[in-house]
UniProtKB/Swiss-Prot annotation:
Its main location: cytoplasm. GO terms for cellular component: cytosol; membrane. NCBIfam families: infC (TIGR00168). The gene is infC. The lineage of its organism: Bacteria, Pseudomonadati, Pseudomonadota, Gammaproteobacteria, Pseudomonadales. IF-3 binds to the 30S ribosomal subunit and shifts the equilibrium between 70S ribosomes and their 50S and 30S subunits in favor of the free subunits, thus enhancing the availability of 30S subunits on which protein synthesis initiation begins. Monomer. The keyword Glycosyltransferase does not apply. Keywords: Cytoplasm, Initiation factor, Protein biosynthesis. Pfam families: IF3_C, IF3_N. This is Translation initiation factor IF-3.
Length: 183
């Protein structure tokens, strides 16, 4: 006994256009195999032309009146479309936001390490979110936090630009720096 398995839903699949006998229109605007426009012909005539060329009749635009069909190799057409979709996906880069946390009393050694990480994030093309958390009585000296963020902004001026200026959110001071565009 064989078990019928359902085909998985492939997100990369190109939507299939009606071809050959599956085209429901009576007459179509035909484009030949070499790209020249043949004109408006009956579906039987278009199928005969495609059959003579040993190619498929593919419906390109169903919304047009009459629908536009082209004589082409459908398998090759699907392959090219899938290839283009993969290329577009490969060339896409997703920008992430990386966060570094400071404190008002961050010492110079720790500051340098965190600054190196921020430089690495920005050169990799990611945005950097700098958060400075105040505890207890430190809230009374928010100007120390502002000075620290101004120092960070000055040190990172050659690597990025401030996208969101320092802003208080509860007990945290936040700032977002975006990488500079590469030429």
């Amino acid at each position: 006994m064989t078990i019928k398995r359902e085909m998985r839903n492939d997100k990369r699949a190109v939507p299939k256009a009606p071809i050959n006998e599956n085209i429901s229109a009576r007459e179509v605007r035909l484009i030949g195999a070499d790209g020249e426009q043949v004109g408006i012909v009956s579906i039987d005539e278009a199928l005969r032309i495609a059959d003579e060329a040993k190619l498929d009749l593919v419906e390109i635009s169903a919304d047009a009146v009459p629908p536009v069909c082209k004589v082409m190799d459908y398998g090759k057409h699907l392959f090219e479309k899938k290839k283009q979709a993969n290329e577009a996906k490969k060339n896409q880069k997703q920008i992430q936001i990386k966060e570094i946390k400071f404190r008002p009393g961050t010492e110079d050694g720790d500051y340098q390490v965190k600054l190196r990480n921020l430089v690495r994030f920005l050169t990799d093309g990611d945005k950097a979110k700098i958060s400075l958390r105040f505890r207890g009585r430190e809230m009374a000296h928010q100007e120390l936090g502002m000075e620290l963020l101004k120092r960070v902004e000055a040190d990172l001026a050659e690597y990025g630009t401030v996208e969101q200026h320092p802003k208080m959110e509860g007990r945290q001071l936040m700032m977002v720096i975006a990488p500079k565009k590469k030429k």
